[in-house]
């Protein structure tokens, strides 16, 4: 009898995963397990990156096994910064391979773009829950791509901000964002205008040089730094990085992959999972940065939810 893995397209993943909020409990558990070392049962090497210099791209390979969920996955991600404006292919493309951990059989090949967008935003929401100032009224989003939309969705569900601002290098994309999402969003003409007085800042840009400067940031603000995922790319300047309390998803990955951390020489205070576990404090009263690089265990948690939902509905 022939057998082949289930192929789940982006619309399938969207249907079976639903709101990013459904991921929150499982992701908090996964973050805590990851930061528990061998006791947490997460086996996850740092992402392997294969440069494709000829075409200004790279292939990232992200395998993981999580004993708690009994989930075995590998995510493949490609990123091409030199994409032609006429190209119909997105700059980021991801695929998740979901295996049966008991025998190694490939159970499913999933579109990973929805998974990546939703799990990344959900982890930012977890960081914000722990680290944002007690009275947070103004949310600022820098960038207007896929991650901006996924972050806005879950942040509107989980928090009550009185004002939301957005900036994007191409202003028409910020205007499109404001017209598309539910709720009032103020489009700003500069980063400084957008971040001045903001309590929570989300950076989801394609920047390779700092765009956010410490002199503009309100003391005590919380920043979710999501872009700049290569060791020579940055979104935040030295003033922010050296004077903040710095949290990361993975110390090992941040010291290998994050230009914001490596080039500034900033000291990492804690992994987010350590805060979730309660072994490291959340310094709400200080300016905090959560540097998010994304982890394979986050993809595994989301992929398992998708697969279990799909298989139960067959």
UniProtKB/Swiss-Prot annotation:
Reaction(s) catalysed (UniProt annotation): L-pipecolate + NADP(+) = Delta(1)-piperideine-2-carboxylate + NADPH + H(+); L-pipecolate + NAD(+) = Delta(1)-piperideine-2-carboxylate + NADH + H(+); L-proline + NADP(+) = 1-pyrroline-2-carboxylate + NADPH + H(+); L-proline + NAD(+) = 1-pyrroline-2-carboxylate + NADH + H(+)
Subunit architecture: Homodimer. Binds the thyroid hormone triiodothyronine (T3); T3 binding inhibits enzymatic activity.
Entry's family note: Belongs to the ornithine cyclodeaminase/mu-crystallin family.
Binding site for NADPH: 91-92, 119, 144, 146-147, 168-170, 173, 205-206, 226, 292
EC number: 1.5.1.25, 1.5.1.1
InterPro entries: NAD(P)-bd_dom_sf, ODC_Mu_crystall, ODC_N
Tissues where this protein is expressed: Expressed at high abundance in lens, but outside the lens it is preferentially expressed in neural tissues, retina and brain.
Superkingdom of the source species: Eukaryota
Upper classification of the organism: Eukaryota, Metazoa, Chordata, Craniata, Vertebrata
Gene3D superfamilies: NAD(P)-binding Rossmann-like Domain, ornithine cyclodeaminase, domain 1
Name the UniProt record assigns to this protein: Ketimine reductase mu-crystallin
